[in-house]
Structures are given as structure tokens and as C-alpha cells.
Amino acid sequence: MDVKKKNNMVITRKIEVFVCEDDKDLRKAYYEKLYASRDIAVKVANMCASHLFALDNTMPYLSDEDKEKVTFLGVSGDASTKRNAPYVAASEAFKGQADMGMVSCVLQNVQKMYQDDRKKGMWARSLRSYKSNMPVPYQAKRFANLHFAEYTNGNGEKREGCFFTLTGIPMQMRFGRDRSGNRTIVERVADGDYKMCTSSLQFDGKKIFLLLCVDVPKKEVKLDAKKILFAYLDVDVPIRCTTDVKAAKEYDSGMKWFEIGTKEEFLYRRRQIQEFVRRCQINNKYTTGGKGRKKKCQALEHWHEKELNYVGTKLHMYSRMLVDVAMKHKCGKIVLVNQKEREEKAKEENMRCEPFLLRNWSYYGLKDKIKYKGRMVGIEVAEE
């Protein structure tokens, strides 16, 4: 039975942006406005999380109905409930200083994550806090006048760039090598073929990135809903998969399996980077101080970032290859076999002071990427 699945899904693309203004003083003022909005977003997020936590934990003598009617001190006007109290407090504190649409989006994100944390169990972790690297969301209508136009770069060459205006600030996108096809997606957004959703700005040092969220149609793929691709996530071989049910039950037989990646390919380079980190930690003892911790640990942070980037790239590649195998064999479902058992075993080894597996192999990141790429083509992903 062939099933043709076609739905829409929201994808996120990371694109570098910068203020497009020739006047030096005006450009500086625009950047100050962006960073001030970022600081306000961080304050609003932490304030909202604190308010929600206080309402849930500091008034045990009140009934649930009374908690919904509690108002905050200092809020003028009508009484505010638990749902809209954070927005009322934020509007009183920051109205006129930042875009209130951005403030509303921040509050919605914080409330959603707070409710998710409550379901998982607040006692299992500390209250979520927000720092300066958090994405600052803006409504899609705030990204005005999105268009492509010719411009002259610093070398006098004519190029075509993408320009838009965000809360009165002229900005331009920098696509770079564009191996992910971001320019094509933005062109379709500008033409009206794709719908732009609430997107965010993320500040990374001196760079600003646009986390562009776009509602795109899923790829039309003919899949057999009854056909299943069985996959094992392992350390020796990152992914082993098969469409044969008998082979899936006889994992150790080594027959009829398709292997994705090798232990040497993934772990060897990662262990090299970890060795660089260890050397930096040792050498930091002998470096000259007096210029701050950030300067002293600069090399260490560099290699930490390299390791994260390497792991993310590899997991993207492995998950892409697994979904391609499922599409090739027209499998409508991917089953991760014995995955829960393997994760429990890894946790036990970690508790026995043998942290190699969880330290060097990323079960959770790989699972999330497989599910994300599977949804793009209509493939269901399940665990056993």
C-alpha cells in the first residue's frame, strides 16, 4: 500500500545579518538599539520565569482558583491573572523602550518552556535561566520590505544582496558560501511562495545571526506505510539499519545490514579534539595572568567550540544518510531497536565511573536529528 504524504512543516535556517548603513554614527546607534533590545529580552525572560515559579511554589495556602486571581503589586489598571500578569508587568517596565511584539513573543516562549519543564518534573532540574545568547524572537510582520537588490561592495564590484528592515533598522543578509541553499529559500519567501513565521535574532560575540523560520511544504515521497526500517544506534558503528525483520532480531549475525559511519571515523577525530582541550587545561596553569579569565581560557573555549561543531556536523550527516536509506527503500517508518535499553545501560556505566559512552557518543542529539529529517519527508520515527 503506497501512501503519498504531503503536509507543511516549519524549518529554521541560520543566516548572518548586519546593519546596512553607511553613516558611522547612525550605524553605531542602530547596533546599540539592537543590543539594548537583546538585554531587555533577557530581563523579561528571567522575570517571567521567576513570576511563574513564585506563583506555583510560594502560596500553598491558596486554592487553585485563588492562584489564578492573584495580582502583582505595583500593576495599575485592571486585575491581572496568572496568564497575562507577566505581560502586564513587562509592559509597565519596558513600554517605549522595546518592541512590545518582541516582548510578547519572549513571554510566550518562556511560558511554553516552563510548562514543558513542569511536565518533566521541576524537582529534576533547577529553574531555567536566560543569558545574553538567547534568541530574541520577532513577529514575521516586523521583518518589512524583504527584497533583493544590487549593491556595490567595498571593492567596487556589483553584487546582489538581500535587504530588509527590522523595527526601523535597515539590515542585510550575508549568505557566504551558501551550501545549504539559504538564498533560494529567502528568494521564495520574498516572492511569496513560502510563508515566513516568527523568527529570531541571536547574538554571538560581534556577529548577529537571523534564525529564519519558514513554513515549507514537505517533499512528496511515495512511502509504504507497512514497510519498516530497523536501526541500531551504537558506538562501534554509529548506525546499523536493515529492512529485514529476521535480520533485526538477529543483530549479532552481521547479515543483511547497512552500516552508516565507523567508530574510527567518529571517535578518532573527537578524541583528538579532546586531547587538545586537555593540553590547553594543563598549559593554562603556566600562562601569564592579569588580563582576565576570558583571555586566559581563549584557546580552551576555541577547542570546546570545535568539538561541538564537529559532533553536530557528523550527526547531521549520519541522520541524513539514514533517512535517505529509508526513502530509497520506500519505508514509511523508522524503528530505533532496543534504544531505551541501550540508553539505560549507558547511564549505568556512567554511574560506575565509566563515562566514556555518554561523553563521546550523543544518543539524544542523533535521535532528534533523525526525527526532524524524518518529519520533513513524512517518515514516522519510533523507539523500542
Regions found by a protein language model. Give the residues of each.
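Residue-level signal for secondary-structure boundary elements
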Residues: 42-49, 53-57, 115-123, 281, ...
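Residues in well-ordered beta-strands of folded domains
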Residues: 18, 200-202, 211-213
